[in-house]
Amino acid sequence: MSSVKRKQPPATLLQRRVRPRYEPEPESDVEEMSDAPSEEGAGFDSEDEEMSEAEMRSGSDEENSELGSDPEDGEDESEDDTPQPTHQLSFGALAKAQAALGDKLNKRKRRSSSAASEASSSRDNSNNDNKFSLEKNHKKPLEKPSRTSKHAPVELSSKRQVSRRRDFLLDPTSTKPQHRDPRFFAPSTMSATSKIDEIKARKAYAFLDEYREKEMQELRVAIKKSKNAEEKEKLQKALLSMESKKKAQERKDKAQKVLDEHKKKEKELVRQGKNPFYLKRSEQKKRVVVETFKGMKKGQVDRAIERRRKKVAGKEKKLLPWARRTVEDR
């Protein structure tokens, strides 16, 4: 054993464990050790002394860096401001750096989460304000129409909400539905029920024909008195429209009269025990035509037949295909 005495480190350094840095030994040292085995003891002792001194120095440096009491460290730090490479740093310094970075990241996350929570709370408050304003502006539901007694008619308001669509450029007749009064206009669909309703309405409001006749007479007088050409033309068109409607209604009344007479006869035959006979559409038209020609003179009948022939011929021509052009036509 060598007689060299080792220096004892302080008690604080003995309690602290520091892992030595691994450094590969040069090949020359290994060869010397193999050549001189007699000097192993002395070499080991000197190396142990150097390691102990390095440990003491590193421990004292770490303590000074932790406590911050040694003034010489500030001078060393000011002198060595250049960053050291990571492979030369100790594990303690790396751990401290990682802890510091983790604290910074946690602070950033907390700030972002707090900002997001504030934004969501502000959005919720704005939504609540909007809901409150909508509920405030929302009108109360309208009261249901009431009546004084169960026999009295229901009182309804004549007010109607104006449409927000600006359809002044459109044709009102094509877009807006036209309201129809069943007393004056026949229903568009001629089903069995609508036909019955039309007959009932015609019988119930037959007195309107007298009013229409008076209106036509007033129009004739106004046409004679008017001197404005445009106004006179409008009055003539209105008179012509009313006259055509009157003639069409008379034709319908005659056709309905023929059917009513046939039904009356069939009812009497059914009472006698015979089977009912229903007229076809074609037979109904024939009987209506015969009934209209009965009250006409010969010249009137000829003119009516000619008009009917031209009408049928025009319909047939519309159904025919267009003639192909030939070389002569070119």
Curated annotation (Swiss-Prot):
GO BP term, pick one: maturation of SSU-rRNA from tricistronic rRNA transcript (SSU-rRNA, 5.8S rRNA, LSU-rRNA)
InterPro entries: RRP36
Biased composition, class Basic and acidic residues, residue ranges: 132-146, 243-264
Biased composition range(s): Acidic residues: 25-38, 61-82
Pfam families the record matches: RRP36
Keywords recorded for this protein, A-Z: Coiled coil, Nucleus, Ribonucleoprotein, Ribosome biogenesis, rRNA processing
Low complexity biased stretches: 113-131
GO CC entries: 90S preribosome; nucleolus
Keyword Phosphoprotein: no
Coiled coil: 212-272
Chain spans, region Disordered: 1-189, 242-264
Localisation per UniProt entry: Nucleus, Nucleolus
Family recorded in the similarity comment: Belongs to the RRP36 family.
Known partners and oligomeric status: Associates with 90S and pre-40S pre-ribosomal particles.
Purpose: Component of the 90S pre-ribosome involved in the maturation of rRNAs. Required for early cleavages of the pre-RNAs in the 40S ribosomal subunit maturation pathway.
The name this protein goes by in its record: rRNA biogenesis protein RRP36
Gene, per the UniProt record: RRP36
